[in-house]
UniProtKB/Swiss-Prot annotation:
Disulfide bonds join C166-C192, C253-C284. The most N-terminal extracellular/lumenal domain (referred to as I-II linker or polycystin-mucolipin domain) contributes to a structure with a four-fold rotational symmetry in a tetrameric assembly; the structure contains a central highly electronegative pore with a 14 A diameter. The pore is critical for Ca(2+) and pH regulation. The protruding structure formed by the I-II linkers may contain all the interaction sites with lipids and proteins in the endolysosomal lumen. This is Mucolipin-1. Its main location: membrane. It is found in: Late endosome membrane; Lysosome membrane; Cytoplasmic vesicle membrane; Cell projection, Phagocytic cup. The chain crosses the membrane at residues 66-86, 299-321, 351-371, 383-405, 428-448, 492-513. PANTHER family: MUCOLIPIN, MUCOLIPIN-1. The gene is MCOLN1. A motif (Selectivity filter) lies at residues 469-474. Keywords: Adaptive immunity, Calcium, Calcium transport, Cell membrane, Cell projection, Cytoplasmic vesicle, Disulfide bond, Endosome, Glycoprotein, Immunity, Ion channel, Ion transport, Lipid-binding, Lysosome, Membrane, Phosphoprotein, Transmembrane, Transmembrane helix, Transport. It comes from Macaca fascicularis. GO terms for cellular component: cell projection; late endosome; late endosome membrane; lysosomal membrane; lysosome; membrane; phagocytic cup; phagocytic vesicle membrane. Palmitoylated; involved in association with membranes. Phosphorylation by PKA inhibits channel activity. Dephosphorylation increases activity. Homotetramer. Homooligomer. Can heterooligomerize with MCOLN2 or MCOLN3; heteromeric assemblies have different channel properties as compared to the respective homooligomers and may be tissue-specific. Interacts with PDCD6. Interacts with TMEM163. Interacts with LAPTM4B.
Length: 580
């Protein structure tokens, strides 16, 4: 028979032994009451990690941040669309003017010939140079656009003139291929010829000779081909973008800096010819548009966006601050009562990443909106910077919507899968990146001189990434096939290089990557949560058995929750669906 003292002794020992458990006692004896201070802290912790729906049920607190985010999504998206239409017109205007300049100033230019457009004889080079200058002088008579000359050109070599024709060459250069000798002084000398545009209106016939003598000095240009580095033509033109009238905006005044380059650095018998432009936008003087509508609505709308984002920033920053203060209180309490040090990962559970994302989007939106107001007032011209700020902020705002979708169990699959798979995916990507960079460097140094897609490290990376996705695979092989006659060794290496890369990354790396995601998805399908073990902080909070409708969270309204929140959630899912 069992000794009766045995159970009584073990029971006594169990009761006298300190138990670090969180409020769960097994046995017939009642659990010691929880101190009011600890119960209050646990209840506040539970309320802090509640969803907006549960907070509404607990205190009758309306989800103001949720409603504000919905309003912010609408106004930010509308603002982005309005600015996008305006920015599209500005970018299109710059691109079309650049194309027009290439057809005007480059002799024999055709669309799509930027990489192959070049001069191969001395006569072709002289003709190309003189054609560009002649077209510049005759621009008002030949151009379909309305352009004006700018004296000074913004270049130090123009010396107050409208156009600068410069050749750069080595200070001393003697090359004798017959004897395999050369004598080069690498110091570069620049000689420029200034050309002034004709005055408008056209001069009288008696002044034709003087005009011809004044504007044809560039015809005396003599190029030093044996030591020539390059020839450049630089000038500036003014024009007005009238397309903005479509969006009920005041037109912008543009100044285009045009640079034509004849590049002879390689001394290979081929001189590439290129034309590049830089557009500078400034406010027009004394603008007058008949029947132009009032633009105050755009300004008022931008002010509404700034106020909305400022309010969102304050609310989210306040929530982050409350989390930080509650974290400090929890850390001090656990150390004072249980001498337990809270780990960094438990501290980070108080930091709501979604609020950080929303705060970042608010800062970007406010900055972009202020810049947009300056652009529409013609005080700024940073279209690209403004578009990046507004575009990124809109992306973050829409991504922030996922937080509220995760309160629904069926919509939480994406975030839960990412949370479970992210650590493994990051470790896996670190290993893959080492192999990928090795292939990039190898392809660039070996195949770069023979394949246009391997000419730079960025192009190599883009090409290899396309191969992983199965794009341009045949074109890449075909381009190397054409080089087989030039170097059979390089061609053989390219076959080994491409086949090994494709086999490794498509059949192994991609398969393992997909397997990691699939494994994470299979994990979250098991009962008991989103695939991750319950942390000690969540276990501590779970000891608070008070439901949101118990009235112990400061009695509030018990009305039905918002349609955008989750209703009737199972208590077992309450903590598994939390997204901090």
């Amino acid at each position: 028979m069992t000794d009766p003292a045995g159970p009584r002794g073990s029971e006594t020992e169990r009761l006298l032994t300190p138990n670090p458990g969180y409020g769960t006692q097994v046995g017939p004896s009642p659990a010691p009451p929880t101190p009011p201070e600890e119960e209050d802290l646990r209840r506040r912790l539970k309320y802090f990690f509640m969803s907006p729906c549960d907070k509404f049920r607990a205190k009758g607190r309306k989800p103001c941040k949720l409603m504000l985010q919905v309003v912010k999504i609408l106004v930010v998206t509308v603002q982005l669309i309005l600015f996008g239409l305006s920015n599209q017109l500005a970018v299109t205007f710059r691109e079309e003017n650049t194309i027009a300049f290439r057809h005007l100033f480059l002799l024999g230019y055709s669309d799509g010939a930027d990489d192959t457009f070049a001069a191969y004889t001395q006569e072709q080079l002289y003709q190309a140079i003189f054609h560009a200058v002649d077209q510049y002088l005759a621009l008002p008579d030949v151009s379909l656009g309305r352009y004006a000359y700018v004296h000074g050109g913004g270049d130090p070599w123009t010396n107050g003139s409208g156009l600068a024709l410069c050749q750069r060459y080595y200070h001393r250069g003697h090359v004798d291929p017959a004897n395999d000798t050369f004598d080069i002084d690498p110091m570069v000398v620049t000689d420029c010829i200034q050309v002034d545009p004709p005055e408008r209106p056209p001069p009288s016939p008696s002044d034709d000779l003087a005009l011809l003598e004044g504007s044809s000095s560039y015809k005396n240009l003599t190029l030093k081909f044996h030591k020539l580095v390059n020839v450049t033509i630089h000038f500036r033109l003014k024009t007005i973008n009238l397309q903005s009238l479509i969006n009920n905006e005041i037109p912008d005044c543009y100044t285009f800096s045009v640079l034509i380059t004849f590049d002879n650095k390689a001394h290979s018998g081929r001189i590439p010819i290129s034309l590049e432009t830089q557009a500078h936008i400034q406010e027009c003087k004394h603008p007058s548009v008949f029947r132009h509508g009032d633009n105050s609505f755009r300004l008022l709308f931008d002010v509404v966006v700034i106020l909305t984002c400022s309010l969102s920033f304050l609310l989210c920053a306040r929530s982050l601050l409350r989390g930080f203060l509650l974290q400090n209180e929890f850390v001090r309490f656990m150390w004072r009562q249980r001498r337990r040090v809270i780990s960094l990962w438990e501290r980070l559970e108080f930091v709501n990443g979604w609020y950080i994302l929303l705060v970042t989007s608010d800062v970007l939106t406010i900055s972009g909106t202020i810049m947009k107001i300056g652009i529409e007032a013609k005080n700024l011209a940073s279209y690209d910077v403004c578009s990046i700020l507004l575009g990124t902020s809109t992306l973050l705002v829409w991504v922030g919507v996922i937080r509220y979708l995760t309160f629904f169990h069926n919509y939480n699959i994406l975030i839960a899968t990412l949370r479970v798979a992210l650590p493994s995916v990051m470790r896996f990507c670190c290993c893959v990146a080492v192999i990928y960079l090795g292939y990039c460097f190898c392809g660039w140094i070996v195949l770069g001189p023979y394949h246009v897609k391997f000419r730079s490290l960025s192009m190599v990376s883009e090409c290899l990434f396309s191969l992983i996705n199965g794009d341009d695979m045949f074109v890449t092989f075909a381009a190397m096939q054409a080089q087989q006659g030039r170097s059979s060794l390089v061609w053989l290496f390219s076959q080994l290089y491409l086949y090994s890369f494709i086999s490794l990354f498509i059949y192994m790396v991609l398969s393992l990557f997909i397997a990691l995601i699939t494994g994470a998805y299979d994990t979250i399908k098991h009962p008991g949560g989103a695939g991750a073990e319950e942390s000690e902080l969540q276990a501590y909070i779970a000891q608070c058995q008070d439901s949101p409708t118990s009235g112990k969270f400061r009695r509030g309204s018990g009305s039905a929750c918002s349609l955008l929140c989750c209703c009737g959630r199972d208590p077992s899912e309450e903590h598994s669906l939390l997204v901090n």
